[in-house]
Amino acid sequence: MKDALQCPSLFKAYEKHFRIGAAVNSFMAFDPAYRALIRRHYNSLTADNQMKPESVLDYAATLAKSDLLHAAVDFTRVDALMYFARDNGIAMRYHTLAWHNQTPRWFFAKNWSTAEDAEPASKETMLARLENYILDVMTHVNEKFPGLVYTWDVVNEAIEPELKAPGLYRAWSPWFKTCGEDFLFAAFRAARKGQAPGQTLCYNDYNAFEPVKRDAIIDLLKKLQTENLVDTMGMQGHYVMDWMNVPLCEEAARAYAALGLKIQVTELDIHCNSDDEAHSRKLAQLYGDYFAMLKKLKEEGIDIEAVTFWGVTDQDSWLTGFRKETSYPLLFDRAKQAKDAYDAVMKAAK
């Protein structure tokens, strides 16, 4: 293994093909070792949590406003990462504007109530709150950091086939329970209003390669396209080494591209529960095959804009907590050393 800071740059290896990004947090932005690694290898950044609604919505300030349609926002965490990206010449993906998760319960409640049994706000109220929130965020970012954000994740994870609800939507989501499908259109309409030149609007989801979910996502994208509301499909890419299927990923990417959409891989990692030699070789093979596939599609004319890893090193991966076992899913290990998977990704670029 080699020190990541002594290795050739990932993003420079792929700069003729697509951006290479990473999900980062505020700690990384202020830690010298992480800062150096990020500057060397990535030309796109995504906030892992700092730009989700729960990190931006300000409850006390919302109550003080006495406006039941307009929540207050606090951009302290957003701005910290935006400054880091701007000062280092790195483009940003904004993740995410509308999501059922990591959005405070009071945002969906009548009178901004925090009570466990709070009455839900009406559909009309929620659609107004959604539009106001999206426009507040986009206006702030685009005015304070012009040209920095190139893509907005407008809606995140609206499809869940296992629920078998109409449209295979995530029916238990407070957005769907209150607003139904209309929330999707409202979110993208608001984002179109707030969009700056050169920015794209993205629908983002996991397991987007799985055929049943893929087809449901395509149905949703086609509906959004009737109003020209979506530009990009975000294929998250949270894979597990034992069942990752690169041909299915390719098939899905081709299907989304056939709609005329740009493609981004937005949250790439491959769960691997051992760092022994056999697992390391298998992880490297999968990463190499995956990037070779993406490069091939790009060379065929499919508009793959960016590939973003969900984390920088194995140390900061969310998967160890989520999977409840140590995960080794990324290209750099806990000591910031390049793994075999890094070598495979670099080889695929040639």
List where the protein language model places each region.
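Boundary/entry segment of secreted carbohydrate-active catalytic domains
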Residues: 1-44, 48-50
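Aromatic-rich peripheral "rim/lid" segments of glycoside hydrolase catalytic domains that contact
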Residues: 3-10, 57, 126, 140-147, ...
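Surface-exposed amphipathic alpha-helices with a cationic face
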Residues: 6-15, 82-86, 188-196, 225, ...
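Hydrophobic/aromatic residues located in beta-strands of well-ordered beta-sheets
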Residues: 20, 92, 201, 263, ...
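Acidic-and-aromatic substrate-binding clefts and catalytic sites of carbohydrate-active enzymes
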Residues: 23-33, 54-57, 69-76, 159-163, ...
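Short, acidic/polar
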Residues: 26-39, 131-140, 211-224, 287-294
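Substrate-binding cleft and catalytic face of glycoside hydrolase catalytic domains
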Residues: 40, 44-61, 67-202, 206-208, ...
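Aromatic- and acid-rich polysaccharide-binding/catalytic face
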Residues: 42-49, 150, 156, 199-205, ...
